[in-house]
Amino acid sequence: MPLFTANPFEQDVEKATNEYNTTEDWSLIMDICDRVGSTPNGAKDCLKAIMKRVNHKVPHVALQALTLLGACVANCGKIFHLEVCSRDFATEVRAVIKNKAHPKVCEKLKSLMVEWSEEFQKDPQFSLISATIKAMKEEGVTFPSAGSQTVSAAAKNGASLNKNKEDEDIAKAIELSLQEQKQQYPETKALCPPAESQLSNKVARRVRALYDFEAVEDNELTFKHGEIITVLDDSDANWWEGENHRGAGLFPSSFVTTDLSTEVEAATVDKSNVIDDDVEEIKKSEPEPVYIDEGKMDRALQILQSIDPKDPKPDSQDLLDLEDICQQMGPMIDEKLEEIDRRHSELSELNVKVLEALELYNKLVNEAPMYSVYSKLHPAPYSATAAGVPVQTYPVQSHGGNYLGHGIHQVPVAQSYNLGPDPMGSSRSLPPNMNSVTAHTIQPPYLSTGQDAVSNPSYMTQSSHLQAAAGTAAYTPAMGVSADLSSFQSTASGLPQLAGFPVAVPVPPAPQPQASYHQQPLL
């Protein structure tokens, strides 16, 4: 799919403004005017194609394009008037007049603008034509007056109408004469054969066709290369009248030769050369696909910098083509710049997000970990007895039922076990030498009836029992615990006497004066 769609009016406009045209083809011009209203965006495309021909370097082509422009303004209605009164058209008109085009082209364009300003002066939508004329007059450009323009336009229109009428009359007369000749030939042949032979010897002439010719009008003759044509009238230097097996009609004299001995091969070679030339011209006229080419832009800038502004010579065709291509690159360059800007914005947003993520990462790395606070709330579990700490075991002997109170059954002796030092002693407020004692419940002294006390005086207190069982290593309670231990005697007297368990008690240090400590409740 091409990047740019072809202008639907370009081919017809080029045909109507061909530099080889001798007169204006009004049938084609009116056909173009009719297509403007029926084609989508027709007014803009048609005006663009016309202005392209107005800027042609051949003045004859530019004058024909201005004639076509005037016909479109007069016949296409308001849609074409709005395009003529647009800013783009005003800019192109300024460029044509200020670039010092051919004087006849400039004068005709100025005359058309004055005529349009007079025609559109009552409609405020078309005031740009008058404003453009006024601005250019202030810049020193001269325009013809409205009165002289009206008179010259009327005279020109009248002359053109008369000329068209004369051409139509001549064409009708030629057609009638041809019909009369066709009707008279059979009668002449039947009535007077000698006169016919004399006429044929005098008028008829045979020629050979060099190229193919396809009839466009009804009164033209179609023939192929190499065919023999009988010439009936050669009074006109350009168009002859002749006949062949297809009929009779007019044909161009340059397409035939009077030399019947010309080899067909030579004509074929000439025809192939002509076809090659036509193909090359078509290829040149076909627009190349436009894309962003930095080389062409640099080349155009280099040519522009090398040109002398004071040089009166017109610009080369190569420069004009490069300028046209560079102008067509404009929208594509704008789209490319928009895409680059959009990608730059996306990358900028991504960069901001990456920086925010890095900042958050650094913040989290520099913060203190939460698990250190959590570990302080949960102390370590009890450890085994530290190595090197002596542990003494006090055996407890079970005694008979003489030491039981009334109604209390004997409890079997439990298995002996050892308790290590209390690991939580360091977190309390008691002195270090009292940790192991306060960590365990002290067995209250056994109080029995008087009979038991008499029979067994050695078991009055738990301390006396422990001293008798331990032998030399007697246990002496600390001073700060005596008051606490005595508070349990009243409650323990009603309980049955249980078998004692060996308790690990550290060796008490030498007696030292100690400060008073107060026990705090455990957490």
From Swiss-Prot:
Region (Interaction with HGS): 334-368
Organism domain of life: Eukaryota
PTM comment text: Phosphorylated.
Region (Interaction with USP8): 219-220
A Pfam family matched in the record: VHS
Subcellular location as annotated: Cytoplasm; Early endosome membrane
Record-annotated ITAM domain positions: 360-377
SH3 domain sequence ranges: 202-261
Role noted for this protein: Involved in intracellular signal transduction mediated by cytokines and growth factors. Upon IL-2 and GM-CSL stimulation, it plays a role in signaling leading to DNA synthesis and MYC induction. May also play a role in T-cell development. Involved in down-regulation of receptor tyrosine kinase via multivesicular body (MVBs) when complexed with HGS (ESCRT-0 complex). The ESCRT-0 complex binds ubiquitin and acts as a sorting machinery that recognizes ubiquitinated receptors and transfers them to further sequential lysosomal sorting/trafficking processes.
UniProt similarity note: Belongs to the STAM family.
Entry's free-text remark on domains: Contains one Pro-Xaa-Val-Xaa-Leu (PxVxL) motif, which is required for interaction with chromoshadow domains. This motif requires additional residues -7, -6, +4 and +5 of the central Val which contact the chromoshadow domain.
Quaternary assembly: Component of the ESCRT-0 complex composed of STAM or STAM2 and HGS. Part of a complex at least composed of HSG, STAM2 and EPS15. Interacts with JAK2 and JAK3. Interacts with ubiquitinated proteins and the deubiquitinating enzyme USP8/UBPY. Interacts (via the via the PxVxL motif) with CBX5; the interaction is direct. Interacts with VPS37C. Interacts with ubiquitin; the interaction is direct. Interacts (via UIM domain) with UBQLN1 (via ubiquitin-like domain).
Name of protein: Signal transducing adapter molecule 2
Organism, scientific name: Rattus norvegicus
